[in-house]
Every structure is written in structure tokens, then in C-alpha cells.
Amino acid sequence: FIIYIATYGFYYLQIKLKSKFNRNIQYGVVGIFLIFVIYKMIIFHPYQNLYFGTLFKNNIHNKFEIDYWGLSANKFLNDVIVLEKNKYPIKIGVASFLTLERSIKILNKEDREKIVIVGQEYQNADYIYTAFISEVDINGNDKYKIPSNFTKIDEFILDGIRIYEVFKRTQ
């Protein structure tokens, strides 16, 4: 539907701006926008679902889900497997509503067997992953509060947008 409206808009502008000079300006503007979109898509690959998040003010990211599909969780799991290549099992707590089950299915069988998801049982976790997605008000509910015996060791920021953070047990 948006493509239809955009096409109609260009058609209308073309009728109104019949001179060749104005048409070249129109093609130039479209070309600039296409270059911008292509550039952003290359930067965000494979996280293209985050593309429109850059169009809003920085504080808007704190109010909405950023990585709803959990694509970044696959990156996190691969990083942890490389970091803890000799450890079995690697116990991961999740401090967000986003489940890691879909991301685990993407891993190969050998890596899948190394990972154990312990959910919010943080006392059993080696690492805690948070994607800042919550079904509860985090200001009044401590369900996803990171315990004090965990220290932030990594965060994934893409074009200024904080996607996830990783905490490791310090004891």
C-alpha cells in the first residue's frame, strides 16, 4: 500500500514538474534515498529488522522492543561457545521476556548440547543474557533484575542502539 501511494506521488510530481530539469532533481532525490537505504541495510545485516529504529530519537529505544525476533541471541550464543570452548555445560540465565530457545535451534548439534538455559534461576547461571524485553514493568518488578554477583562483560550496540547485554558470574 505504501508503494502504491509513493508511486502515485511520483506520478503526480512528474505531471506537475514537466521540465527536464525538475525531473532530474526528482531522480536525484530518489537516488539519494536509495543510497541511504542500501547503506543502512548493509550496516544492519543480518539485523535488518532493526533498521527503522534509527529513524526515531535515541530515547525511544527504551520504550519499545528492539530485537523482537532474537536474532542477536544467536550472535551471543556463538560468542559464549567460543569463549567457553572447554566448558560443559554452559548455563545461561535470561533476564528478559525473549526466550533463547529459537536461537539455540540455529546452532549445530554439538554446540546445542553445550548450552543449558536456566531461565530466571540466576543462582544456577554462569551467564545472564538480557535483550531489554519485558512483559512486566521493570520499575516495579524485580523479575529481571541482574543479581549483584554478576558483572557486565559484553554489550552489543548497533548504530548507537543497545541490542543486548551479557553478564558473567563473578564468584
Model-derived regions, located:
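Aromatic/acidic, Gly/Pro-rich catalytic loop(s) in extracytoplasmic/lumenal soluble domains
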Residues: 111-119, 123-171
